[in-house]
Amino acid sequence: MALQFIFGNPGSGKSHYLYEHIIRESMKHPDINYIILVPEQFTMQTQKELVLRHPRHGIMNIDVLSFARLAFRVLEETGNGSREILDDEGKNLILRRLAGKKEDSLKVLKGNIKKPGYISEVKSVISELTQYNISPDGMDDMITEADESSYLAWKLKDIQVMYQAFEEYLADKYITKEEILDILCNVMDKSRMLKDSVIALDGFTGFTPLQNKVLGEMLHHCQKVMITVTMDKREDPYVMKDKYQLFALSKQMVTSLVKIAGEEKVLVEEPVCLYQEPVWRFRNAPALAFLEKELFRYSGRTYREKQSNVRVYAAANPRMEVECAAQRIRFLIRKKEYRYREIAVIASDMNLYADEIEKTFREYEIPVFMDYKRNVLLSISGVFLRWQNRIFLQKVCSVS
């Protein structure tokens, strides 16, 4: 039972080192389970990378999972997966029903609860409270700190009423996605999949209290836990001065895990440090390597060599900004032999740029995947269905 960190700058090869290490060890020890935990959205890409890297192009004793998928696997293995899992729509329906029953007990939310989207916001607050292991009773301290006569305190009291009613309604019937990790902690000692396995975590910048609780149980039951951490060699990863310093999230993650390891009496092994200069990702782009090294450092240093890695364009409006980006992408594809999958467009406000990007890229015949949530009510099909229902209801009313 041990904990090991892999430190390195962005682009230094932390994931590469971790994946290669896991592949080598999995081939040496085919009887040991190796589990790589990544954020939910990266599971498929990580599986693909491992299969391509593996000499045999197969990962029989390596599983790539997120925290939620790991919980499902363990609950299924231990026979604790019989309770139905409630999704977000189910939560909204239950909360709307409970809001009607508790309407007389609500002081602040009473006048807003029927507004479109308000129940969804209440659901999000309750979900976050669950993720951070705060019970309805635990909200008493929050209310006291907020000054019991303040507007915030009254709103928190209403949330507490809804939260308490929600918990009572779910008892022994359903479990939420946020509660799965708490249940996982209670059954982890029964899992043969996790016993003496090697856990590797990649792509995280921090953990919720429930995830930290899961990691504590892993340190107790698993052979080893490895985790990649973005860190600069000029920083001490084990010293957290304040939450506004550079790499504060990484330091908070490291210090909390070291504390958990100490509580579980688990050895913290010597870390792997990947601090070579320039970092691997920018080995052929010295200007970007300099930018990575000096950004937010306020050292006063400037890059004086000629470079073409960083370009700044000024445009009169978002439409012209997007058109400039489209022209540059077309140039890279036609002249520099780039591939579309190698190009990303990052926008500060998708509500402002999304329509312009879709329209302009369609004109330039550039395929694009928009990574943002669309409002279904504003889609063409959504508007069509709503107006169709409205016309039908008007006809029914006129006939009756």
Language model segments and positions:
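Conserved beta-strand -> loop -> alpha-helix junction used to position metal-binding or nucleic-acid-contacting
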Residues: 37-49, 55-76, 90-91, 229-234, ...
